[in-house]
Every structure is written in C-alpha cells, then in structure tokens.
C-alpha cells in the first residue's frame, strides 16, 4: 500500500536504510575495538585466532583441556595467550618458564583468580587452596607447614604404615573392593593425622561427607560450565530466578562445605580436650601451642587449614595409587624389578617401612614416575598475576589467569623421551632428577603444597607394601584372557584412571600372615 508516495514496510521489518546504519555502526564498533586492543595484544604471547568481543571463549575446551593446550604448544610455543570475554589467560607449557615466573617472581604470581561459582557462591575460597594471597593464607599455611614439616611427619609414620597394610589385606580378601579400600584407608590416615579421628568404615559420615565436598569442589572448578563465571553479575539474581539453578546448587554446596568442616573440627577439639582423640594430631598440636591465645579468628583459620589437608589429600592420593596400579598392570617388568629391590633391601622377615625409603632408589623412582606419567592435577590450579609483567619481551597484563600445564611439562619428549612409557630408569636413581618431577607435581612458588612430605610418605608406604607382599596381576575375562585396562582417565581439576581392575595375589603365605599381624594400629 502506498501513502503520499511512500512505501510502508510491514510491521517488524527494518528498512534498508536502518539495516545499513546498523551495519555501519557495528563495523565501526568492531574497528574501534580492534584498534583499542591491538596495541596491547601485539606484545602479548601468541595464541589461537580470537573472535571480536568473545575472544577464545568458544575454543577453551571443557574436556581434558591440558591435551589441547599441549597441542597448541606445538603451534604457538611454550607460553600462549587466550582471551575469554576479556579475561586474559596465560597458559605456560614450559617448566623453565613456570619456575622463572611462579617461583622466582612469586611476589606477583601468588594470587588466585576470582572464581565466582567456586568462591563467591560455593564458599570454597575459605580453604587454603583457593584463599587469596594475604594474611589469612599465610596463617593457614603456617598451621599446616608446622605440623607436616620434614621432622614432624615422622611421628605419623606408624599411622601411614598400618593403613597401607590394612589396605593391601583388604584387597586380598575382597578383590572387588579395590577402590573402596583405597578410599577408606587413605581417608583414615588423613583423619587420624589431622583430627585424631579413627574412621569406623566406608559409610562413616566423617569420610563420606568430605568426599562429597571434594566432588562439589571439582564440579565447581570445571571451566566453561558455570555461566556465572563468565557473567559474574548473575550472582546477584534472586534465588527464585527461572533458569538460575546454579544459585541453588551453590547454596547447597556452601552449606555442606561449612557444616562438614565444622563437624570434624569441633569433634577434634572436644575429643582432644577430653582425651578420646588420638594425639598427636594437627588440630590438637596447634590448639596446644596456642593455649590461652586462641581467638575466634585463629580457630576459624585452623578449621579451614585442617579442611584443606583433608580435602587436598583425599582425591590426589587416591588418584596416584590407582595410577600406580594401572602402571603395574601395563608394565609388569617394572613391577618385578621393584620387587627384586625390596627383597634385597628389606628381606622377607618384615614389611617395608617409610624409614627404608633412602635405601630403595628404584621404588622412589617408581613413585616419581607415577607422578610424571599420570599427574593427579594435570593442569595446575590457576594462579593470578597481581601486577603487569614482562617476560623475554612478552607483555603479561595484571589480572591475567596463569595456568601451568603440568601435563605438558611432564610429557615433553625433549625432556622425557617416550613420555607415554612408564620408565623409572629415566631418573638414574638420582633424587636430583626425581625432584624435577615432584617440584612440578606439587605446585609452584608460595602456592606449592605445604603437605607434600606427608603425601609422599603415604604414597611410598602404600606402593612399597603392595610390591613387597603381592603380585598385582590383571583380572581374567570370560574367555580366560588377561584383561589389561587401557590408559583412560576422567576430566576435571583432579583426574582418576578409569576401570582399573586387578587381583592382588600374595607372593607368599608369610607375606599374607605379616599383613594380618601388622594391619592393626
């Protein structure tokens, strides 16, 4: 229809002139955006093609991201840059660069990025592992470091050794209970050392609840899953907002985190005072040292420090032991060589102890190779850069999320030839070579794991006890063939080998009898 010589467009249809103006406006904004960001980007590390405005948001992988970053390292080099909706992400694929930045420049690389789902909403940033660098971080770390120092951990050797023996005996008696035996015995070590609590069994709420907390932690840290991490303003939505299920999820997780940590801490405090908790333990030691000077703030710091030891030690140690078993199934020659060393050094009259560690270089090499072959945390929990920095002429802006790709560092074929093979011999029995691996596996700078000496003792005694007493052999399938599991693993902050099934066959009846005799603490 025409009116006064003009053509009227149907309702809701933009005219060509309107479309032209919109297109020009968009292109102008795009050009201005590119000009505004180009100067900064040209001196930053290289990285994959980035789209205007959204950057690399759609390219950041949610499944096994360390493998993608490892492939990108072949194209872009040892340090690469990603842009997620304006958030700079620096991925480091080189151990040398990671040490230079995160260790030597730790004063500006020790922050944590602002994690909305895990921190603001779920409350996980109260734990040391996500705590911003500052006074509270230093206080919690001091509590842990004092009780789990090289000298202090010796008083916990008997706990670790007894649990290792119960674990192996439990798997011998019930081959289908491998994972549950690993879980309950590692949890029993940590609960006794941290709180003085003796675990009652696999369904004890003092361990089932912490495992649930760790599941929530891993879920909250998964990149790209929570829209609120990309659009932080969404955290202010009312709880009843349609579609904002993340708010309800975070509320449940937060309550579970706080009530679980208070439950185990308050039990430890009361039981240490009335003499029913096993002492020494971390909480009792700190409270005794602070006698008369305990403030509510210090007590809360202790609660979260203890919770960090519990949470940080559960899944990582479980992952490492499962990876060790997988390696023994796939590389039986390594298992036999390790057993020869134990037999020669320890003999058959007793079980190995943590104090034997200096005399067992091949066993130490096996443990180190497990850390390298399947690191429990392949992509280090991100650091945050608190000031602008320059490395080898490359600009690294303040506020960047810094992600050390530990997987790539430990699978770099130029440093570790044939990286997918399990070869303890690659260290030549030298602790100096093994340290290069453990230094990467346990974190960087001021964020390095304060309980690594304790963790290494736990892993060593379990590995040595398994090798001394049992042959770890594949299960037999319905066709009578050995069923050797593939090297597959989950995704997430902490990863686990999948479908690890085996049989623990006692090497001698004497070995079984020794386990029975020694498994009671």
Swiss-Prot record:
EC number of the protein: 1.-.-.-
Sequence intervals crossing the membrane: 12-32
Keywords of this entry: Glycoprotein, Heme, Iron, Membrane, Metal-binding, Monooxygenase, Oxidoreductase, Transmembrane, Transmembrane helix
Family annotation (InterPro entries): Cyt_P450, Cyt_P450_CS, Cyt_P450_E_grp-I, Cyt_P450_sf, Cytochrome_P450_fung
Gene Ontology terms, MF aspect: heme binding; iron ion binding; monooxygenase activity; oxidoreductase activity, acting on paired donors, with incorporation or reduction of molecular oxygen
Pfam families in alphabetical order: p450
Cofactors (names): heme
Membrane topology note: Single-pass membrane protein
Disulfide bonds: none
Residues bearing attached sugar chains per UniProt: 218, 274, 317
Keyword Heme on entry: yes
Functional pathway: Secondary metabolite biosynthesis
Top-level class of the enzyme under EC nomenclature: oxidoreductase
One cellular-component annotation, GO: membrane
Compartment(s) of residence: Membrane
PANTHER family: P450, PUTATIVE (EUROFUNG)-RELATED, P450, PUTATIVE (EUROFUNG)-RELATED-RELATED
Function: Cytochrome P450 monooxygenase that is able to use anthracene, carbazole, pyrene, phenanthrene and trans-stilbene as substrates for oxidation. These multifunctional properties against a series of polycyclic aromatic hydrocarbons (PAHs) suggest that CYP105 would play important roles, at least in part, in fungal metabolic systems involved in xenobiotic detoxification.
Family under the similarity heading: Belongs to the cytochrome P450 family.
Protein name (database record): Cytochrome P450 monooxygenase 105
Organism: Postia placenta (strain ATCC 44394 / Madison 698-R) (Brown rot fungus)
């Amino acid at each position: 229809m025409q009116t006064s010589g003009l053509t009227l467009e149907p309702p809701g249809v933009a005219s060509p002139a309107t479309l032209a103006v919109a297109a020009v406006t968009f292109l102008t904004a795009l050009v201005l955006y590119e000009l505004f960001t180009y100067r900064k980007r040209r001196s930053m590390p290289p990285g994959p093609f980035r789209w205007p405005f959204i950057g690399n948001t759609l390219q950041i992988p949610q499944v096994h991201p360390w493998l993608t970053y490892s492939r990108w390292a072949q194209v872009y080099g040892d340090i690469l840059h990603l842009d997620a909706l304006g958030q700079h992400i620096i991925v480091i694929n080189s151990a040398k660069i990671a040490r230079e930045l995160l260790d030597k420049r730790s004063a500006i690389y020790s922050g944590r990025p602002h994690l909305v789902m895990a921190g603001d909403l779920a409350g996980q940033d109260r734990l040391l592992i996500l705590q911003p660098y500052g006074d509270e971080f230093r206080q919690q770390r001091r509590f842990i470091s004092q009780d789990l120092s090289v000298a202090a951990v010796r008083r916990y050797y008997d706990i670790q050794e007894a649990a290792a023996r119960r674990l192996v005996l439990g798997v011998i008696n019930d081959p289908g209970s491998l994972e549950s035996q690993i879980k309950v015995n590692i949890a029993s070590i940590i609960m006794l050392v941290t709180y003085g609590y003796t675990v009652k069994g696999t369904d004890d709420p003092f361990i089932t609840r912490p495992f649930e907390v760790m599941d929530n932690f891993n879920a909250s840290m998964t990149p790209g899953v929570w829209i609120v991490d990309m659009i932080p303003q969404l955290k202010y939505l009312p709880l009843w907002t349609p579609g904002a299920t993340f708010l309800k999820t975070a509320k449940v997780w937060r309550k579970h985190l706080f009530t679980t940590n208070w439950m185990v801490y308050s039990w430890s405090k009361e039981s240490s005072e009335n003499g029913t908790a096993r002492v020494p333990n971390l909480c009792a030691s700190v409270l005794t040292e602070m006698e008369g000077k305990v403030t509510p703030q210090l007590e809360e710091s202790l609660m979260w420090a203890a919770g960090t030891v519990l949470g940080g030690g559960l899944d990582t140690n479980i992952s490492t032991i499962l990876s060790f078993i997988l390696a023994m199934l796939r590389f039986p020659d390594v298992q036999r060589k390790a057993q020869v060393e134990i037999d020669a050094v320890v003999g058959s009259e007793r079980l190995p102890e943590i104090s034997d560690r200096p005399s067992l270089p091949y066993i130490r090499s096996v443990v180190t190779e497990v850390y390298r072959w399947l690191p429990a945390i392949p992509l280090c929990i991100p650091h945050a850069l608190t000031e602008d920095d320059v490395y080898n002429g490359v600009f690294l802006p303040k506020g960047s999320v810094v992600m050390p790709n530990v997987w790539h560092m430990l699978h770099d074929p130029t440093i570790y030839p044939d990286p997918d093979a399990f070869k303890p011999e690659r260290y030549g029995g030298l602790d100096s070579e093994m340290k290069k691996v453990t230094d990467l596996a346990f974190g960087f700078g001021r964020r390095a794991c304060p309980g690594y000496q304790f963790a290494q003792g736990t892993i060593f005694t379990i590995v040595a006890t398994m090798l001394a007493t049992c042959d770890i052999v594949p299960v037999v399938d319905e066709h009578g063939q050995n069923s050797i599991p593939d090297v597959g693993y989950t995704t997430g902050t902490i990863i686990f080998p999948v479908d690890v099934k085996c049989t623990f066959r006692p090497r001698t009846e004497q070995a079984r009898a020794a386990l029975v005799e020694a498994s009671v603490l």
